[in-house]
Amino acid sequence: MTEPKSYKDTVNLPQTDFSMRANAVQREPEIQQFWTENCIYEQLSQNNPEDLFILHDGPPYANGSLHMGHALNKTLKDIINKYKLLRGHKVRYVPGWDCHGLPIELKVLQSMKSEEREGLTPLKLRRKARDFALKTQQEQAEGFKRYGVWGDWENPYLTLTPEYEAAQIGVFGQMALKGYIYRGLKPVHWSPSSRTALAEAELEYPEGHTSQSIFAAFPIIKSSKDAQEILDPFLSNLGVAIWTTTPWTLPGNLAVALNPELTYAIVEQTSNLCNYQYIIVAADLVERLSATFSTELTVKATLPGQILEHTIYRHPLYDRESEIVIGGDYVTTESGTGLVHTAPGHGQEDYIVGQRYGLQVLSPVDDAGNFTEEAGQFSGLNVLKDANQAIINELKNKGSLLKEEPYLHKYPYDWRTKKPTIFRATEQWFASVEGFREAALEAIKSVNWIPPQGENRITPMVSDRSDWCISRQRSWGVPIPVFYNEETNEPLLTEETINHVQAIIAKQGSDAWWELSIEELLPEQYKKDAHKYRRGTDTMDVWFDSGSSWAAVAKQREELKYPVDIYLEGSDQHRGWFQSSLLTSVAVNGIAPYKTVLTHGFVLDEKGHKMSKSLGNIVDPLVIINGGKNQKQEPPYGADVLRLWVSSVDYSSDVPIGQTILKQLSDVYRKIRNTARFLLGNLHDFDPEKDTVSYDQLPELDQYMLHRITEVFTEVTDAFEKFQFFRFFQTVQNFCVVDLSNFYLDIAKDRLYISDTNSLRRRSCQTVLKVAVESLAKAIAPVLCHMAEDIWQFLPYKTPYQSVFASGWVEMQKQWERPELTASWGKLRQIRTEVNKVLEQARNEKAIGSSLDAKVLLYVSDQDFKKQLESFNPNDSLKGNQVDELRYLVLASQVELVDSLEAIKKADYQSESELVSVGVVKAEGQKCDRCWNYSTKVGEFSDDPTICERCNAALVGEF
């Protein structure tokens, strides 16, 4: 007896060197090396045919390691840039760094021994700060590159370079010459712990701050003319009640403000609450205050607020008299007494009211937060420590204290030192927003805000904001280029002085301000008077630094443009960089520096908690990429999985990350990779020039698949155009799993493996696989850039493009659009799903192993549908196009369309549904040794007695 033949060498199995495992830790850097060596980004950014596209980088702070917020932000930017490159745009991305300011100064000071700090000059400190910033910038740049981010890494922008600083001085100068810059004694957010003024964006409001709040009464000594008749009967024993959460500001009290629209009451208290039998409060609050003070308050008279204006009271702690004044709509009955203690040196609203009434700006507090001699008996006490209690005790002694109680509220802290700030009037430099507020609000309307609520956030911020305090009392920053007359203290700030300093800084950097003599810093016409001047020691707010980047980078670099296409940062930047950039750009040029602003949320842990060292829930992007110390618990996922996470989340709100999420994403990544590997493996012998099958010759299944490809990649394109990357993620994942792996490729194996190499049946399928693999590589390239390039480099045929990024975006042909196929193939896919359920039932009960062991019976009641199915079920496997057949659709050896439900009911395994009823029985005939299908023809071919008619034909090139 002869040995049965082996047919394994006659089957076309997949062949590819594209690895099933990504091995990202090793492979991704190799791909990045390929991009660098071949200047892929540089070539495309210069040679692409379409318009220039500029996403302008908001500079991260050159301070510390990269965190998940950086990873989210930089990856979002890179996804957009890579998509625009694939669409043929010239994309120039210049990464930037914010290098000045207090946080860096603090890091440097913390690293120094106390004796080192003793002899520290501004220049020594600046050099150390510069070294620290540059070292951090280099480390961060390496991290960003490892994420796969493309950009002009050799030529980033740093806010500490001479050309940047000079452009910033230019912005300041233009604003000064337009009258928008002024010096004033005004209350600003002051950080005693940092000893400098702070901008709104440098504050944070932690939960759980408790202040000691007080109610106090000030003695009324003289009535206003209009209120005389009502007040005089009570005047000998009358107080006006105020409430404050900052008792330390009482030494600065110069007025009490009321709301002219409110009605006020004179109430009597008889329980020795304070020294005054009668007190004035808002009429609406009498009941609430009775409860607060735990004493009966009896209304003796009421009067409109307006007539109390100019009533005079005496300060309970000092020998000075002040007036009751009309405040703004901030005086309400929501809390307090309806009358507001007003200290123009300690509050923005107080200051505005004080200006209206010509009040002094009194702020008896020094840089460290200690009372000065102006505060009298409290001199030397610290306002955030012992001053509050001392003042409360003194009010008690004077019989003015009505009540003290702890008050939990939001209070501004210094974002770096994490310590409370105060409002304190100091001589500062301001940008007067009033001068260009309307223009800024108009500019906001011209911008495309994504998501749209971004506009609703920034509009009230700009419309309500006070003037911008731009001076800082620190050394590490760009100097405010002003000189002061030694005798009069008057500032010298002219076009000539600004231009001269700007030219010096452009050559020598801002150290020159500290290095050169006054004579050298002054222009020619002022040199002879140099001895009369001293240089200013203030530096500019870092938000003015980064807020000038449109001028120092976008406008100044030839390869860029202004306004730019897009700014993209976290939602906290509505009060930070988006706003400072808008204000400077509008002040100087009357336009917004950006056309679109896109914002993202913050990164939280898997439980939705903020990440913090104390909670131990910090996720480190480099650990995601390279793995942690324990690689079982923290495996190395590579940059692409991190990037896939970025594309999977709805970044418009806060986004979670953690090991469970990463594991799920890693599974999705692997599915996409395995799909690509199958496609590549089955194209190993395909030469597109010779083997492509024309569209009209393709079986209907393939035409349907090209239609699906059109639908899928139209959706993906729309997702990228609208920056909705989570739609890309869902669509591509679904396409790879549902359309390809579970459907088309599952059916395709029979065509690809057992047909003759050159058969139409096989080449038509490969024609679709080529479209699928190239479309997939291009579409995932903005996100999974390393995998996309890897796929492209393993294409088994020649292409004219060195890199996937040079190949352009997904191309779809008009003729592939066949919506009518969606309906008919939708039904066929439904039949496949129903059949699979019954096959699974038979498999579970061990009636069959593979689905090829089965014959499937189908019954449909709809006659038209039955006709369609009959055309998909020829009697002879070698007739028709050998693809559009029910047996291949359901992967069974035979399919029979039966005329009645009875036949189905006789089957061993069955199911009924509205569309189709399914029965499964054992397949007829014998199993073919080559394709494992059952056939009644096995044994009919004397040379090959163990194979079926299809395989017999395939071996001679006819199937």
From Swiss-Prot:
Residues the entry annotates as binding Zn(2+): C928, C931, C948, C951
Cofactor: Zn(2+)
Compartment annotation: Cytoplasm
Disulfide bonds: none
Residues the entry annotates as binding ATP: K613
PROSITE patterns with a match to the protein in the record: AA_TRNA_LIGASE_I (PS00178)
Record motif 'HIGH' region, residues: 60-70
InterPro entries from the UniProt entry: aa-tRNA-synth_I_CS, aa-tRNA-synth_Ia, Anticodon_Ile_BEm, Ile-tRNA-ligase, Ile-tRNA-ligase_type1, Ile-tRNA_ligase, M/V/L/I-tRNA-synth_anticd-bd, Rossmann-like_a/b/a_fold
Keywords of the record: Aminoacyl-tRNA synthetase, ATP-binding, Cytoplasm, Ligase, Metal-binding, Nucleotide-binding, Protein biosynthesis, Zinc
Pfam hit, one: tRNA-synt_1
Note describing how the cofactor binds: Binds 1 zinc ion per subunit.
Matches recorded under CDD domains: Anticodon_Ia_Ile_BEm, IleRS_core
Motif ('KMSKS' region): 610-614
Main location: cytoplasm
Gene Ontology CC terms: cytoplasm
Family classification: Belongs to the class-I aminoacyl-tRNA synthetase family. IleS type 1 subfamily.
Subunit structure: Monomer.
Its biological purpose: Catalyzes the attachment of isoleucine to tRNA(Ile). As IleRS can inadvertently accommodate and process structurally similar amino acids such as valine, to avoid such errors it has two additional distinct tRNA(Ile)-dependent editing activities. One activity is designated as 'pretransfer' editing and involves the hydrolysis of activated Val-AMP. The other activity is designated 'posttransfer' editing and involves deacylation of mischarged Val-tRNA(Ile).
Name this protein carries in UniProt: Isoleucine--tRNA ligase
